[in-house]
UniProtKB/Swiss-Prot annotation:
Pfam families, A to Z: FrsA-like
Domain of life (superkingdom): Eukaryota
Entry annotation: catalytic residues: S238
GO terms, molecular function: hydrolase activity
Protein's recorded name: 20-hydroxy-prefusarin hydrolase FUS2
Source organism per UniProt: Gibberella moniliformis (strain M3125 / FGSC 7600) (Maize ear and stalk rot fungus)
Hydrolase is among the record's keywords: yes
Length: 419
């Protein structure tokens, strides 16, 4: 695979943007020009370059809107939203940096201006969560000429460790709408604005979060918008793949797509550390103080490690690297949890992932679905960047759309004419 950046981390995040080009999330020329302004491994240059490109895309959107170019304005606003999202992404080592919230709000604002111009109906909602807390959600409905017969099948889309609801559009709604599916996406605790504004931390029992969202969808949304609750699926990618499996035990979910999710987040992190060091910490031989000192020393020379632990502390609401690992120990599907899933399930893996390799994730997850027959569960391992081999199918979103909706069509008995 050709690399734009020598750093695997920077290259992956660049491809994350570039991969949205087919769905108006970026322009190739804009991305290549922006990449030329970034110093590999330097998050400040990354922020400045994508901020500048976001401003340029937003200016193009406003120029198009001023002359009545609906399509041009829509596409440019959506690109601007994605560039704003990317700009603040590598600043998460210091969550109190005011640029994070400013760029996040700019991303949401640009996306809100873009979706009203889509060839679809999009509605924004506030989902009752806990007490007076509400979560942001969006319902995407297919245009009349894309409608399938009967009620509208719907995909409930959950984010993951570092996504925002605006980015989820490219993974879900962009592929669902022209195929006649509705999508309901949301940002939960530890994600998007609930993290940045509400300071809500990620919950490891994500099934609780989704139960609140499902209450809202089934009671308030489905009747008004003709959603088919007998054809309701959940979809999540990367950590979202894990979260979707946590939620799939709810009987209201009729199908689950878990894209490249982990089986046990702590065991994955453990496998990337020297065994004597992590085992010493687990046994108490290595103290928290020493563990934290070593990790902090590594973050000074390895930006990827710095970002992963910095973002982890923020999302999990903890103060030290040792505490990050303690939360990770709770993020596991072991112990029989997978046997509780009764709905048809598609598991995907990424053969070339440097995060969640299939041998210790997708494969054992698939085998753990013991309540499902061979015709109720399916495993797909993507290979190569062009075939969905990178984590979360980065660079192959059209491929994952095809695989996912072909499987959902079969699961929900949706028939289409041969072309």
């Amino acid at each position: 695979m050709h690399k734009v950046f020598a750093s695997d981390f920077f290259n992956f995040e660049f491809l994350r943007l570039l991969g949205t080009v087919p769905f108006q999330g970026a322009e190739v020329g804009e991305c290549l020009t922006t990449a030329g302004r970034i110093k590999d491994g330097d998050p400040e240059s990354w922020y400045r370059a994508w901020r500048d490109q976001a401003e340029k895309a937003q200016a193009l959107a406003e120029e198009a809107a001023a002359v009545g170019d609906r399509t041009g304005a829509c596409w440019a606003y959506i690109r601007a939203a994605n560039y704003w999202r990317a700009s603040e992404f590598l600043l998460h080592c210091t969550p109190n940096d005011p640029r994070i919230l400013a760029a996040s709000k700019a991303s949401v604002n640009a996306f809100d201006k873009g979706w009203v111009l889509l060839d679809a109906t999009v509605k924004s909602f506030e989902i009752p969560y806990d007490k007076d807390i509400k979560l942001p959600g969006r319902l995407y409905l297919p245009a009349p000429h894309h409608r399938l017969p009967g009620k509208i099948p719907v995909v409930l889309q959950t984010g993951g460790f570092d996504s925002t609801q605006e980015e989820l559009y490219f993974y879900g709604a962009a592929g669902a709408l022209p195929r006649g599916y509705a999508v309901f996406s949301f940002d939960g605790p530890g994600q998007g604005l609930p993290l940045r504004v509400g300071k809500l931390k990620l919950r490891t029992d994500w099934e609780y979060v989704v139960s609140q969202v499902l209450d809202f969808v089934t009671d308030d949304i489905a009747p008004e918008y003709d959603l088919d609750l007998e054809r309701l699926a959940i979809f999540g990618a990367s950590l979202g793949g894990y979260l979707s499996l946590r939620a799939a035990v709810d009987p209201r979910i009729k199908a689950c797509i878990s894209c490249d999710g982990p089986l046990d987040l702590f065991e994955i992190t453990r496998s990337r550390m020297p065994s004597w060091f992590i085992n010493g910490w687990l046994s108490g031989w290595v103290s928290d103080g020493l563990f934290n000192w070593v990790v902090d020393a590594l973050t000074a020379v390895n930006f990827q490690i710095a970002w992963e632990f910095g973002h982890g502390k923020w999302v999990f609401g903890v103060e030290t690297p040792a505490d990050v690992l303690r939360v990770m120990q709770q993020i596991s599907l072991k112990g029989g949890y997978l046997s509780k899933i009764k709905c048809p399930t598609l598991i995907t893996g990424a053969a070339d992932s440097f995060y969640f390799t299939p041998d210790i994730n997708a494969n054992p997850i698939f085998e753990g679905l013991t309540a499902l027959g061979s015709n109720e569960k399916h495993l797909w391992i993507g290979k190569g960047v062009e075939g969905g081999g990178l984590q979360a199918k980065i660079g192959a979103l059209a491929v994952v759309h095809h695989k996912m909706f072909t499987w959902l069509d079969s699961t929900f008995a949706i028939k289409r004419d041969v072309l």
